């Protein structure tokens, strides 16, 4: 019996989908930048993504583009950046559930300005991060920016590894020789 799962994404916009990205997460990744952010961090890497209406609607064609990139045997997983992915609510949750269903062997990384500790259990935002293998949390802070931070913009940000719903600090992954440039 073939099971097909399709969850509706209605209001999520994106700016860019990149097939081969080696900067945002471990290995070769497909990356998507969603639009909309309410943090407006000084010296943000992507201020053009603050407006939720910027970019294009993440429709079935965009989703199929991401899925086709994830089918590539060289692709290790999906990276979700922004903007602020957690502002996408049910749309982001549905999208990540589909990615998890169709590509269980691929890892999912997500960057958010929210801190995991501030998210309410059972909230949509918390359900989103539970779909991810790695979450980089915290707002970008100019005075804590560092050139030697592999997957973070500033040292206050923390890389968390999801181990069965428990988030374990994993900043040491930046020092793994396999992932250095």
Regions found by a protein language model. Give the residues of each.
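Conserved Radical SAM active-site core
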Residues: 3, 10-14, 28, 46-110, ...
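A generic structural signal for alpha->beta connector loops
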Residues: 11, 105, 131-132, 156
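N-terminal pre-triad scaffold of radical SAM enzymes
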Residues: 13-40
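Conserved C-terminal portion of the radical SAM core fold
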Residues: 71-80, 107, 136-142, 146, ...
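P-loop/Walker A phosphate-binding loop and immediately adjacent motor/lid segment at beta-alpha junctions
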Residues: 88-96, 100, 145-181
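Structural recognition of alpha->loop->beta junctions
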Residues: 121-144
């Amino acid at each position: 019996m073939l099971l097909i799962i399709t969850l509706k994404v209605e209001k999520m916009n994106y700016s860019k989908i990149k097939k081969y990205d080696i900067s945002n997460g471990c290995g070769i990744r497909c990356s998507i930048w969603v639009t909309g952010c309410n943090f407006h961090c000084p010296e943000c890497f992507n201020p053009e993504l603050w407006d939720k209406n910027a970019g294009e609607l993440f429709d079935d064609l965009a989703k199929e583009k991401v899925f086709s990139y994830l089918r590539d045997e060289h692709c290790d997983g999906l990276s979700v950046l922004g903007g602020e992915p957690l502002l996408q609510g049910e749309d982001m949750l549905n999208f990540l559930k589909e990615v998890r269903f169709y590509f269980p062997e691929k890892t999912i990384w997500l960057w958010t300005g929210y801190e995991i500790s501030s998210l309410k259990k059972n909230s949509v935002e918390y359900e989103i991060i539970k779909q991810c293998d790695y979450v980089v949390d915290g707002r970008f802070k100019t005075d804590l920016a560092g050139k030697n931070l592999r997957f973070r913009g500033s040292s206050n940000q923390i890389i968390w590894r999801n181990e069965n719903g428990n988030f374990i600090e994993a900043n040491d992954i930046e020092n793994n020789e396999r992932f250095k440039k």
